[in-house]
Regions:
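Gram-negative bacterial Sec-dependent N-terminal signal peptides
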Residues: 3-19
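Boundary at the C-terminal end of the N-terminal hydrophobic targeting segment
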Residues: 19-22, 27
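Edge beta-strand at a domain terminus
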Residues: 28, 161-182
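Central antiparallel beta-sheet cores of small beta-barrel/beta-sandwich binding domains
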Residues: 32, 37-40, 56-144
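N-terminal helix-cap/turn-to-beta initiation motif at the start of protein domains
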Residues: 38-53
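A short, Trp-centered hydrophobic/proline-enriched beta-strand micro-motif
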Residues: 51-57, 164
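Residue-level recognition of beta-strand termini and adjacent short loop/turns
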Residues: 124, 156-160
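Exposed beta-sheet edge/beta-hairpin loop segments within beta-rich domains
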Residues: 142, 151-155
Length: 182
């Protein structure tokens, strides 16, 4: 009896937790109220292709250091937001992706203590680039350290591989970083 009870409890918890994750074809309701899915830009769709966990190594141009990295993208908020949990050399950060008025807005919560906001500069089937949205970021190049741009390029020969590149402004100097991910 204990085994059956444990199994049923686990099934209920697992089923309830899976029910909270939205897919493209499911309507999301909270308390019987339908939630609108407002994330439909081409850039949001490009980020959705990355859902899951990607791991690899990053090379930092400033020091030449090579270190382990992981990036995990999850769909949340009824399918309207994607969160990216980043771990670079053991340091965790967070980036959010959501559409506002049909445009992808990216906000990065950085280990540098800054929160740059980005807009899409290019999106295609093979890559997506974002750059600092200076109108929405209260950051000054003379006074702050922050990520200035990011780019993801999918490997055409291997759908389970991509390259991630970013540029970071550190004490007025730009450093470029590159990670190969699987």
């Amino acid at each position: 009896m204990k085994t059956i009870t444990t199994f049923l409890a686990a099934a209920l918890v697992f089923g309830a937790s899976n029910a909270a994750v939205a897919s493209d074809s499911e309507a999301v309701t909270v308390g019987g109220v339908a939630m609108e899915n407002s994330s439909s830009s081409a850039a949001f769709a490009a980020v959705k292709k990355k859902l899951g966990k990607w791991e690899g190594q990053m090379t930092q141009s400033l020091t030449g250091a090579v270190f382990d990295v992981s990036y995990e993208w999850r769909l949340t908020s009824g399918g309207n937001t994607i969160t990216e949990t980043i771990v670079e050399d053991g340091v965790e950060m967070l980036t959010t992706y959501n559409d506002r008025d049909g445009e992808l807005v990216v906000k990065h919560y950085c280990a540098l203590g800054t929160e740059p906001v980005f807009k899409v500069s290019e999106v295609s089937d093979a890559s997506m680039s974002i750059a600092l949205d200076e109108a929405k970021s209260d950051l000054q190049r003379a006074h702050h350290n922050f990520v200035t741009d990011m780019k993801w390029t999918m490997d055409a020969s291997d759908p389970n591989a991509m390259v991630f590149e970013n540029s970071v402004l550190l004490d007025g100097e730009v450093t470029n970083n590159r990670a190969e991910l699987k």
